[in-house]
Amino acid sequence: MPQLNPGPWFAILVFSWLVFLTIIPTKILSHISPNEPTPVSAEKHKTESWDWPW
């Protein structure tokens, strides 16, 4: 019975886990945080306050 021969199946198992542990986490992490947070600038806005003309 060839299905009891662990040679080819073990290689397939190791290769599939290698794919899961190297490629899949990078794909998942890129979707979890797609954008880097932009730093908040400490500059004051250049708009000036104005009063209502009444």
UniProtKB/Swiss-Prot annotation:
GO terms for biological process: proton motive force-driven ATP synthesis. One of its GO terms (molecular function) is proton transmembrane transporter activity. It is found in: Mitochondrion membrane. Residues 42-54 have a biased composition (Basic and acidic residues). One of its GO terms (cellular component) is mitochondrial membrane. Signal peptide: none annotated. It is a single-pass membrane protein. Residues 35-54 are annotated as: Disordered. The chain crosses the membrane at residues 4-24. Belongs to the ATPase protein 8 family. Component of the ATP synthase complex composed at least of ATP5F1A/subunit alpha, ATP5F1B/subunit beta, ATP5MC1/subunit c (homooctomer), MT-ATP6/subunit a, MT-ATP8/subunit 8, ATP5ME/subunit e, ATP5MF/subunit f, ATP5MG/subunit g, ATP5MK/subunit k, ATP5MJ/subunit j, ATP5F1C/subunit gamma, ATP5F1D/subunit delta, ATP5F1E/subunit epsilon, ATP5PF/subunit F6, ATP5PB/subunit b, ATP5PD/subunit d, ATP5PO/subunit OSCP. PANTHER family: ATP SYNTHASE PROTEIN 8. Subunit 8, of the mitochondrial membrane ATP synthase complex (F(1)F(0) ATP synthase or Complex V) that produces ATP from ADP in the presence of a proton gradient across the membrane which is generated by electron transport complexes of the respiratory chain. ATP synthase complex consist of a soluble F(1) head domain - the catalytic core - and a membrane F(1) domain - the membrane proton channel. These two domains are linked by a central stalk rotating inside the F(1) region and a stationary peripheral stalk. This is ATP synthase F(0) complex subunit 8.
